[in-house]
A protein has these predicted regions:
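A short acidic, amphipathic alpha-helical/loop segment
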Residues: 163-168, 189, 256-261
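Active-site metal-binding motif and surrounding structural segment of the metallo-beta-lactamase
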Residues: 128-177, 265-273
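Cap/insert and terminal regions of metallo-dependent hydrolase folds
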Residues: 2-5, 9, 32-43, 47, ...
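Catalytic core of the metallo-beta-lactamase
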Residues: 103-107, 205-269, 284-286, 290-294
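Metallo-beta-lactamase
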Residues: 5-143, 179-247, 270-276, 328-350, 355
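Acidic/histidine-rich helix-loop elements
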Residues: 119-136, 220-227, 280-289
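Divalent metal-coordination and catalytic microenvironments
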Residues: 106, 116, 154, 212, ...
Length: 357
Protein backbone atom coordinates (compact mmCIF):
# COMPACT_ATOMS: atom_id res chain seq x y z
CA UNK A 1 0.00 0.00 0.00
CA UNK A 2 1.45 3.39 -0.92
CA UNK A 3 1.92 6.16 1.64
CA UNK A 4 -1.18 8.08 0.53
CA UNK A 5 -3.50 5.08 0.83
CA UNK A 6 -1.88 4.01 4.08
CA UNK A 7 -2.57 7.44 5.52
CA UNK A 8 -6.17 7.40 4.30
CA UNK A 9 -7.07 3.99 5.69
CA UNK A 10 -5.11 4.20 8.92
CA UNK A 11 -6.54 7.62 9.70
CA UNK A 12 -10.09 6.39 9.03
CA UNK A 13 -9.48 3.41 11.27
CA UNK A 14 -8.19 5.67 14.03
CA UNK A 15 -11.19 8.00 13.93
CA UNK A 16 -12.16 7.33 17.50
CA UNK A 17 -9.03 5.96 19.10
CA UNK A 18 -6.24 8.38 18.27
CA UNK A 19 -7.65 11.64 17.05
CA UNK A 20 -9.61 11.22 13.80
CA UNK A 21 -12.73 12.66 15.36
CA UNK A 22 -10.94 15.99 15.55
CA UNK A 23 -12.74 16.65 12.26
CA UNK A 24 -15.86 17.14 14.38
CA UNK A 25 -18.22 19.92 13.40
CA UNK A 26 -19.75 22.12 16.06
CA UNK A 27 -23.33 21.36 17.00
CA UNK A 28 -25.95 23.03 19.14
CA UNK A 29 -27.26 19.73 20.53
CA UNK A 30 -25.70 16.51 21.70
CA UNK A 31 -26.29 13.41 19.63
CA UNK A 32 -26.52 11.24 22.75
CA UNK A 33 -27.28 13.09 25.96
CA UNK A 34 -29.41 15.95 27.23
CA UNK A 35 -28.94 17.14 30.78
CA UNK A 36 -27.97 20.02 33.05
CA UNK A 37 -24.73 21.92 32.65
CA UNK A 38 -22.05 20.82 35.12
CA UNK A 39 -18.36 21.29 35.84
CA UNK A 40 -17.61 18.80 33.02
CA UNK A 41 -20.59 19.27 30.65
CA UNK A 42 -21.30 22.50 28.76
CA UNK A 43 -24.81 21.52 27.61
CA UNK A 44 -23.57 19.85 24.41
CA UNK A 45 -20.15 18.34 25.08
CA UNK A 46 -18.29 16.85 28.00
CA UNK A 47 -14.81 18.09 28.90
CA UNK A 48 -11.96 17.57 31.36
CA UNK A 49 -12.16 20.23 34.10
CA UNK A 50 -8.98 22.25 34.15
CA UNK A 51 -7.40 20.05 31.53
CA UNK A 52 -6.33 20.56 27.97
CA UNK A 53 -8.55 19.25 25.14
CA UNK A 54 -7.28 16.64 22.66
CA UNK A 55 -4.84 17.81 20.00
CA UNK A 56 -6.12 19.74 17.02
CA UNK A 57 -6.59 18.70 13.39
CA UNK A 58 -3.30 20.20 12.25
CA UNK A 59 -1.53 18.20 14.93
CA UNK A 60 -3.22 15.04 13.66
CA UNK A 61 -2.03 15.72 10.12
CA UNK A 62 1.50 16.48 11.32
CA UNK A 63 1.61 13.21 13.21
CA UNK A 64 0.11 11.00 10.50
CA UNK A 65 2.24 12.41 7.67
CA UNK A 66 5.53 12.91 9.52
CA UNK A 67 5.48 10.52 12.47
CA UNK A 68 8.03 7.73 12.85
CA UNK A 69 5.66 4.78 13.12
CA UNK A 70 7.21 1.47 14.16
CA UNK A 71 6.22 -1.60 12.16
CA UNK A 72 4.39 -4.20 14.22
CA UNK A 73 4.55 -7.91 13.39
CA UNK A 74 1.46 -9.48 11.87
CA UNK A 75 1.40 -11.88 14.81
CA UNK A 76 2.50 -11.22 18.39
CA UNK A 77 1.40 -14.41 20.11
CA UNK A 78 0.69 -14.58 23.80
CA UNK A 79 2.73 -17.08 25.83
CA UNK A 80 -0.50 -18.14 27.54
CA UNK A 81 -3.03 -20.65 26.17
CA UNK A 82 -6.68 -19.78 25.79
CA UNK A 83 -8.16 -19.44 29.26
CA UNK A 84 -11.21 -21.47 30.29
CA UNK A 85 -12.70 -19.60 33.23
CA UNK A 86 -14.56 -21.29 36.05
CA UNK A 87 -18.28 -20.65 36.21
CA UNK A 88 -18.07 -18.51 39.37
CA UNK A 89 -15.53 -17.25 41.90
CA UNK A 90 -17.17 -16.58 45.24
CA UNK A 91 -16.57 -14.65 48.40
CA UNK A 92 -13.61 -12.31 48.76
CA UNK A 93 -11.47 -13.92 46.06
CA UNK A 94 -10.72 -11.86 42.95
CA UNK A 95 -9.68 -13.53 39.70
CA UNK A 96 -8.68 -11.50 36.64
CA UNK A 97 -8.49 -13.03 33.15
CA UNK A 98 -7.09 -10.87 30.38
CA UNK A 99 -8.86 -10.99 27.03
CA UNK A 100 -6.54 -8.53 25.25
CA UNK A 101 -5.88 -4.81 24.71
CA UNK A 102 -8.29 -3.28 27.28
CA UNK A 103 -10.71 -6.21 27.74
CA UNK A 104 -10.92 -7.99 31.10
CA UNK A 105 -12.99 -10.66 32.81
CA UNK A 106 -13.27 -9.95 36.54
CA UNK A 107 -14.70 -12.70 38.77
CA UNK A 108 -15.50 -11.96 42.41
CA UNK A 109 -18.37 -12.29 44.89
CA UNK A 110 -20.08 -14.75 42.55
CA UNK A 111 -20.28 -12.09 39.80
CA UNK A 112 -18.80 -12.32 36.30
CA UNK A 113 -17.91 -8.88 34.97
CA UNK A 114 -16.57 -8.05 31.51
CA UNK A 115 -14.91 -4.67 30.97
CA UNK A 116 -14.65 -3.08 27.50
CA UNK A 117 -15.09 -6.43 25.72
CA UNK A 118 -13.74 -6.65 22.16
CA UNK A 119 -13.77 -9.92 20.22
CA UNK A 120 -13.71 -8.32 16.75
CA UNK A 121 -10.66 -8.44 14.48
CA UNK A 122 -10.46 -4.67 14.05
CA UNK A 123 -11.02 -1.78 16.44
CA UNK A 124 -12.49 0.42 13.75
CA UNK A 125 -15.79 1.54 12.22
CA UNK A 126 -14.72 -0.36 9.08
CA UNK A 127 -14.31 -4.10 8.53
CA UNK A 128 -11.64 -3.54 5.86
CA UNK A 129 -9.37 -0.95 7.49
CA UNK A 130 -8.09 0.29 10.79
CA UNK A 131 -6.17 -1.29 13.67
CA UNK A 132 -6.18 -5.09 13.44
CA UNK A 133 -5.38 -7.35 16.35
CA UNK A 134 -2.09 -9.25 16.26
CA UNK A 135 -3.24 -11.91 18.72
CA UNK A 136 -6.64 -13.52 19.31
CA UNK A 137 -8.79 -12.89 22.38
CA UNK A 138 -7.44 -14.76 25.40
CA UNK A 139 -10.80 -16.43 26.02
CA UNK A 140 -12.78 -18.06 23.24
CA UNK A 141 -16.20 -16.45 23.18
CA UNK A 142 -17.92 -19.81 23.61
CA UNK A 143 -15.83 -20.47 26.75
CA UNK A 144 -17.09 -17.42 28.62
CA UNK A 145 -18.90 -18.13 31.89
CA UNK A 146 -22.36 -16.59 32.37
CA UNK A 147 -21.79 -12.84 32.13
CA UNK A 148 -23.69 -10.71 34.65
CA UNK A 149 -22.26 -7.24 34.00
CA UNK A 150 -20.58 -5.48 31.10
CA UNK A 151 -18.81 -2.23 31.96
CA UNK A 152 -18.04 0.10 29.05
CA UNK A 153 -15.70 2.97 29.93
CA UNK A 154 -16.23 5.10 26.80
CA UNK A 155 -17.22 4.90 23.16
CA UNK A 156 -13.93 4.63 21.25
CA UNK A 157 -13.89 1.59 19.00
CA UNK A 158 -11.18 -0.21 20.94
CA UNK A 159 -13.43 -0.10 24.02
CA UNK A 160 -17.03 -0.14 22.71
CA UNK A 161 -17.25 -2.89 20.08
CA UNK A 162 -20.84 -3.09 18.93
CA UNK A 163 -20.56 -6.53 17.34
CA UNK A 164 -19.26 -7.98 20.59
CA UNK A 165 -22.00 -6.28 22.62
CA UNK A 166 -24.61 -7.78 20.28
CA UNK A 167 -23.16 -11.25 20.77
CA UNK A 168 -23.07 -10.83 24.53
CA UNK A 169 -26.69 -9.69 24.62
CA UNK A 170 -27.83 -12.72 22.64
CA UNK A 171 -25.77 -15.20 24.64
CA UNK A 172 -25.94 -13.78 28.18
CA UNK A 173 -28.42 -10.89 28.48
CA UNK A 174 -26.05 -8.99 30.82
CA UNK A 175 -26.62 -5.63 32.47
CA UNK A 176 -24.58 -2.94 30.71
CA UNK A 177 -23.15 -0.15 32.85
CA UNK A 178 -21.68 2.87 31.09
CA UNK A 179 -21.24 6.66 31.42
CA UNK A 180 -23.81 9.23 30.27
CA UNK A 181 -24.72 9.15 26.59
CA UNK A 182 -23.23 5.79 25.74
CA UNK A 183 -26.58 4.08 26.30
CA UNK A 184 -27.89 5.81 23.17
CA UNK A 185 -24.99 4.37 21.19
CA UNK A 186 -25.40 0.85 22.56
CA UNK A 187 -29.14 0.87 21.78
CA UNK A 188 -28.42 1.51 18.09
CA UNK A 189 -27.08 -2.05 17.99
CA UNK A 190 -28.77 -3.68 20.99
CA UNK A 191 -32.17 -2.03 21.28
CA UNK A 192 -33.44 -4.32 24.04
CA UNK A 193 -30.30 -4.14 26.18
CA UNK A 194 -30.58 -3.59 29.93
CA UNK A 195 -28.47 -0.50 30.57
CA UNK A 196 -27.69 1.67 33.57
CA UNK A 197 -25.84 4.93 33.02
CA UNK A 198 -24.05 7.21 35.42
CA UNK A 199 -22.20 10.48 35.79
CA UNK A 200 -18.90 10.90 37.60
CA UNK A 201 -19.59 10.30 41.28
CA UNK A 202 -22.63 8.06 40.73
CA UNK A 203 -22.93 4.53 42.12
CA UNK A 204 -24.82 1.50 40.77
CA UNK A 205 -25.58 -1.25 43.29
CA UNK A 206 -25.63 -4.74 41.82
CA UNK A 207 -27.21 -7.31 44.08
CA UNK A 208 -26.37 -7.15 47.75
CA UNK A 209 -22.58 -7.21 47.62
CA UNK A 210 -21.20 -5.30 44.61
CA UNK A 211 -21.18 -1.59 43.83
CA UNK A 212 -19.92 0.10 40.66
CA UNK A 213 -18.64 3.65 41.14
CA UNK A 214 -18.19 6.08 38.23
CA UNK A 215 -15.00 8.15 38.61
CA UNK A 216 -13.27 10.81 36.47
CA UNK A 217 -10.45 10.16 34.02
CA UNK A 218 -8.74 12.52 31.57
CA UNK A 219 -9.89 11.53 28.09
CA UNK A 220 -12.52 12.23 25.40
CA UNK A 221 -14.95 10.36 23.16
CA UNK A 222 -16.23 10.02 19.59
CA UNK A 223 -17.64 7.41 17.23
CA UNK A 224 -17.58 9.48 14.05
CA UNK A 225 -17.19 12.90 12.51
CA UNK A 226 -19.70 15.03 14.39
CA UNK A 227 -20.04 13.63 17.90
CA UNK A 228 -16.81 14.56 19.61
CA UNK A 229 -17.14 14.39 23.42
CA UNK A 230 -20.94 14.11 23.28
CA UNK A 231 -20.83 10.98 25.46
CA UNK A 232 -18.99 10.82 28.77
CA UNK A 233 -15.90 8.74 29.56
CA UNK A 234 -15.18 7.34 33.02
CA UNK A 235 -13.08 5.11 35.21
CA UNK A 236 -14.81 2.51 37.38
CA UNK A 237 -14.29 1.36 40.94
CA UNK A 238 -15.66 -2.12 41.56
CA UNK A 239 -16.41 -2.47 45.26
CA UNK A 240 -17.04 -5.94 46.66
CA UNK A 241 -16.48 -7.98 49.79
CA UNK A 242 -12.87 -8.63 48.74
CA UNK A 243 -11.94 -4.96 48.43
CA UNK A 244 -11.89 -2.37 45.68
CA UNK A 245 -10.69 -2.57 42.07
CA UNK A 246 -9.83 0.66 40.23
CA UNK A 247 -10.23 0.29 36.47
CA UNK A 248 -9.18 2.95 33.97
CA UNK A 249 -9.79 2.31 30.27
CA UNK A 250 -7.92 5.32 28.88
CA UNK A 251 -6.50 8.41 30.54
CA UNK A 252 -3.95 11.13 30.29
CA UNK A 253 -1.95 11.49 33.49
CA UNK A 254 -3.17 15.06 34.13
CA UNK A 255 -0.65 15.68 36.94
CA UNK A 256 -2.06 12.69 38.80
CA UNK A 257 -5.12 14.62 39.95
CA UNK A 258 -7.62 11.83 39.38
CA UNK A 259 -5.37 9.27 41.08
CA UNK A 260 -5.13 11.53 44.13
CA UNK A 261 -8.91 11.99 44.16
CA UNK A 262 -9.60 8.26 43.84
CA UNK A 263 -7.40 7.44 46.81
CA UNK A 264 -8.87 10.23 48.92
CA UNK A 265 -12.39 8.98 48.23
CA UNK A 266 -11.90 5.21 48.24
CA UNK A 267 -8.72 4.55 50.18
CA UNK A 268 -6.11 2.12 48.89
CA UNK A 269 -7.00 -0.42 46.20
CA UNK A 270 -6.44 -4.15 46.22
CA UNK A 271 -6.06 -3.97 42.43
CA UNK A 272 -5.85 -1.34 39.72
CA UNK A 273 -6.16 -2.04 35.99
CA UNK A 274 -4.12 0.71 34.36
CA UNK A 275 -3.34 1.49 30.70
CA UNK A 276 0.34 1.89 29.85
CA UNK A 277 0.54 1.63 26.05
CA UNK A 278 -0.41 3.69 22.96
CA UNK A 279 1.50 6.77 24.09
CA UNK A 280 3.79 7.94 21.25
CA UNK A 281 4.36 10.62 20.09
CA UNK A 282 4.10 12.33 23.48
CA UNK A 283 3.50 15.79 22.05
CA UNK A 284 0.23 14.52 20.58
CA UNK A 285 -0.83 11.68 22.90
CA UNK A 286 0.08 13.05 26.34
CA UNK A 287 -3.34 14.58 27.01
CA UNK A 288 -5.20 11.33 26.35
CA UNK A 289 -2.88 8.34 26.99
CA UNK A 290 -0.44 8.02 29.88
CA UNK A 291 2.92 6.34 29.31
CA UNK A 292 4.49 3.54 31.41
CA UNK A 293 6.30 5.90 33.79
CA UNK A 294 3.06 7.79 34.43
CA UNK A 295 1.18 4.53 34.96
CA UNK A 296 3.68 3.48 37.64
CA UNK A 297 3.39 6.89 39.28
CA UNK A 298 -0.40 6.56 39.14
CA UNK A 299 -0.16 3.18 40.85
CA UNK A 300 1.72 4.78 43.72
CA UNK A 301 -0.60 7.78 43.95
CA UNK A 302 -3.79 5.71 44.15
CA UNK A 303 -2.30 3.22 46.59
CA UNK A 304 -2.83 0.08 44.50
CA UNK A 305 -1.31 -3.07 45.97
CA UNK A 306 -1.22 -4.70 42.54
CA UNK A 307 -1.69 -3.54 38.95
CA UNK A 308 -2.78 -5.32 35.80
CA UNK A 309 -1.32 -3.27 32.95
CA UNK A 310 -3.25 -3.16 29.69
CA UNK A 311 -3.79 -1.18 26.45
CA UNK A 312 -0.72 -2.59 24.75
CA UNK A 313 0.43 -5.44 22.51
CA UNK A 314 -2.81 -6.31 20.68
CA UNK A 315 -3.72 -3.47 18.28
CA UNK A 316 -1.40 -0.74 17.05
CA UNK A 317 -2.90 2.66 17.71
CA UNK A 318 0.21 4.83 17.92
CA UNK A 319 3.88 4.99 16.96
CA UNK A 320 5.77 2.84 19.48
CA UNK A 321 6.92 -0.70 18.74
CA UNK A 322 4.79 -3.59 19.96
CA UNK A 323 7.15 -4.40 22.85
CA UNK A 324 8.33 -0.86 23.64
CA UNK A 325 5.92 -0.49 26.59
CA UNK A 326 7.52 -3.52 28.27
CA UNK A 327 11.01 -2.04 28.21
CA UNK A 328 9.75 1.37 29.33
CA UNK A 329 7.72 -0.22 32.13
CA UNK A 330 10.71 -2.18 33.43
CA UNK A 331 12.79 1.00 33.54
CA UNK A 332 10.02 2.94 35.28
CA UNK A 333 9.55 0.28 37.96
CA UNK A 334 13.27 0.32 38.78
CA UNK A 335 13.51 4.10 38.77
CA UNK A 336 10.44 4.48 41.00
CA UNK A 337 11.33 1.66 43.38
CA UNK A 338 8.32 -0.58 42.69
CA UNK A 339 8.65 -4.36 42.78
CA UNK A 340 8.22 -5.81 39.30
CA UNK A 341 5.81 -8.46 40.60
CA UNK A 342 3.32 -5.77 41.65
CA UNK A 343 2.77 -4.43 38.11
CA UNK A 344 1.83 -7.17 35.66
CA UNK A 345 1.88 -6.30 31.93
CA UNK A 346 -1.01 -8.58 31.02
CA UNK A 347 -1.02 -10.87 27.98
CA UNK A 348 -4.11 -12.48 26.40
CA UNK A 349 -5.16 -15.60 28.29
CA UNK A 350 -3.24 -14.65 31.44
CA UNK A 351 -5.03 -15.39 34.72
CA UNK A 352 -4.20 -13.53 37.93
CA UNK A 353 -5.57 -14.45 41.33
CA UNK A 354 -5.18 -11.19 43.21
CA UNK A 355 -3.46 -11.65 46.59
CA UNK A 356 -5.47 -10.61 49.60
CA UNK A 357 -4.26 -7.70 51.69
Amino acid sequence: MNRRNFFRFSTLGLLAVAGGALFARRSNASAYYSGPISDHFDGVRFFNPGGSPPGNFMGLLKWRFNGERATWPENYPSPFPFAKPEMRIGGKDIRVTFVGHASFLIQTAGMNILIDPVWSQRTSPFSFAGPKRVNPPGIRFEDLPPIDLVLVTHNHYDHLDMETLKRLHVAHKPLFITPLGNDAIIRTGVEAARIKVGDWGDVVEVGSSVKIHFEPCHHWSARGLNDRSMALWAAFVIEGPGGKIYHIGDTGFHEGLNYHAARKKHGEFRLANLPFGAYEPRWFMKGQHQNPAEAVEGMKLCGAAHVCGHHWGTVQLTDEAVDAPLAALKTALVEQGVEESRFRPMRPGEVFDVPSA
